[in-house]
Amino acid sequence: SSFYVAFRHDGDSSNMDEQVALDYLKYLMELPNLKVMANANFDLRFVMAEGIIPKAPFFDVLLAERCINEYRSSYSLGALGEIYVGEGKNEDALYEWCHQSFGGRKGRSQAGNIWRAPIKLVEPYARVDAELTLDIYNKQQVLIKQAEVIEIIDLEMRLIEPLLHMTAKGIRMDTDKLKSLGGELVVESRTLTKTLTQIAGRVVNVNAGRDIQRAFDDLGVPYPITDKGNPSFTADFLKSCDAPIAQAISACRKNTKLMSSFIDGAYKKYVVNGRLYAGFNQIGAVTARMSSSKPNLQQTPRDARFRELFIADEGEVLVGADYSQIEPRLALHYCSGEQADELKELFNKTPESDFYAILMTSAPDVERQTMKMVLLAQLYGQGEASLSLKLGDAVTGKRILGSFNSSFPFFRRLSDTVRGVCRTRKYIRTVGKRRCNYQGADSVVIHKAVNRLIQGGAADIMKKAIVDMWNQGVVNNTDFKLLAVIHDEVIITTSLKGDDLKCAMDELERVMVEAYPTTCPMHVDSNKGDNWWDIH
């Protein structure tokens, strides 16, 4: 049966002695037993805030469910309770009591007031949470075996510990530069607004379509119209339009976004004592890729002014290790045929080879970025007409595609094969044995199946690498500390110097390359520097 360890309830005489409660929590968290939880990273961060270091193993029923069925409309504890045991969470009465007692908005927004509620009111809800979590765990075990996802769920559960320690560290920020950059952007905003006003002959609201339309009409600048007859001033159009008015509006919008989204809305809001604490979502997308939030570090501009804000700990250096061209390499791993085998042999001999430079031999006049676009189009099911539009015209598009498929026909064959498997078997598995389900999927979803295979595999590789570097002691909590995982890159702060640093970086690369055996080897680039910009 469950019980509630109650302490720190505001003004409640039934509170357990705080030190006794914390000592008991410490005892539980340091046991080698399995800890079954729901949203483990969130709860364990509170535990760590009390100076308690929880020990693995952990099992998170919400993470497990994402591996069992990636298409649930909700992965909340209440939603899974309804699915597995026919019983969800009903906290309405508790939230209503808090609303009546403390005011504010109704519903879940009252969660922050629960500590102020009496123990006798909170205890039943707390016990239901614990009981529901265990009931779901027991029910899930049957489905885990049936779906044959034991291996990938084990990986996700072993990932909880290193990500927990990573999240708790935060990343040191150059707060002086942060303040200075905020001031620079304010001055820049005034200059850009003044320039726009001079071009338009009046003040223009860059977020009001009608106002922009009027400015364009006054200057006789053409603009696209939607099917419904409305003007369209998208970011892509403004960026591609050569008219000074379009460029000025685009610059103003970009400046505003940088100010609101990154300086005021992200960095300043989440920096505490000189460190930025971002949230990391272990399965942040249907592909199982990780994501970050509050703030989303993946959206940090590729701009020195912003990336220089992220700095190493005092007296240390940052190390960045980034998978090079992981998607095309993983795609080639799945390809077959004589031509594919020849390309694999080349990469096995020289793993550092530039994938896109090789692909460009099929069309020497094509730029690197265009060739990347062509490859992704072939893999991810983009039509010839759509791709030709991006390439400029149908004739050019057809020529480039023809040359590409003639030189590298195995990529198109891979795409066709994967879609065929989805239609017949109704699921595919990634390199880490992650199951991607297609039961009842429509043709549009199946058309993009290779995306799931490649993106899901890239997620598996990064996660396995993190678990391995943690378990093998390559990263630790002393002199080689993991700070962030952003796309295909890990960022580390280290006090190591000279040969010790070189050895650690070599080991980091080795672990990342060897995460999973692939017929086309992975390649990792690592660099060191004082800040995030330097390591690129």
Where are these regions (language model features)?
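Conserved RNase H-like, two-metal-ion catalytic cores of nucleic-acid enzymes
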Residues: 1-79, 83, 288, 332-334, ...
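Conserved "right-hand" nucleotidyltransferase catalytic core of DNA-directed polymerases
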Residues: 1-11, 53-55, 72, 83-85, ...
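Short, contiguous acidic/charged loop-to-helix segments that flank catalytic cores in large enzymes
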Residues: 9-13, 68, 266-271, 306, ...
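A short acidic-Thr-Gly-centered motif at the start of a beta-strand
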Residues: 26-30, 302-317, 471-476
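Conserved catalytic alpha/beta cores of large enzymes that bind or transform nucleotide phosphates
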Residues: 33, 310, 316-331, 342-377
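Short glycine-rich phosphate-binding loop at a beta-alpha junction
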Residues: 33-40, 203-205, 322, 386, ...
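Conserved catalytic core of nucleic-acid polymerases
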Residues: 109-115, 161, 165-168, 221-224, ...
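Polymerase palm active-site segment centered on the conserved acidic dipeptide of motif C
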Residues: 181-210, 404-418, 498-536
